[in-house]
Amino acid sequence: MEKLTVIKVGGKIVEEEATLYKLLDDFAAIEGYKVLVHGGGRSATKLAAQLAIESKMVNGRRITDTETLKVVTMVYGGLVNKNIVAGLQARGVNALGLTGADMDVIRSVKRPVKEVDYGFVGDVKQVNDAFLADLIHKGVVPVMAPLTHDGDGHMLNTNADTIAGETAKALAGLFDVTLVFCFEKKGVLRDENDDDSVIPQITPEEFKQYVADGVIQGGMIPKLENSFEALNAGVSEVVITLASAINGNSGTRIRK
């Protein structure tokens, strides 16, 4: 199968000019087919504040009410996405910015209310792998914003890690897929205060033990759960690494 690299980058990376430019340089240098999925939470929070819209968070997750949905749609699908696309075009990468609503790329359902009502947040149900594969084979690089739709005319805010994972899983039957989660650390750390304490690889058994011991906690837990789900669904390799190291062999590799 032909190789495909799916890169997910967090908002902190794409919202700072210096780190964004470095990321785009490195991403442009990746050989073969590729997809970029991005966040943008800090920019959304900033615009919401400028518009006097309160940003509400529960356990690090945004509550997306009607006004907040307007903000994230503008920021994720507009400002952040188009800045990335323009930057890639300047580097000779023929990129196309997409939300889940465009060509029905990603359809989701509104998350049911349990302990917390997260509002207009979507859980992915379907990825249009045929359309994405057609784009990719034509030499177009999809740049995917963390927005989906429900098929009934409503946009939904959706976790970017989830979009990257579901996209990688959907395309794993058509390509040899490597999924890379990029953030501000060198990888999964044994000690969050020591940037050099990178765990080089993690198996499911080791993951359970690290969680039990409190080594892995917080937002890293769902990131790793997404990683194992992707591997079980046919993705060849999952890497968690520093954004500036996407072309190297550093970081943490997730193993089955």
Locate each region found by the language model.
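C-terminal catalytic "cap/lid" subdomain
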Residues: M1-K256
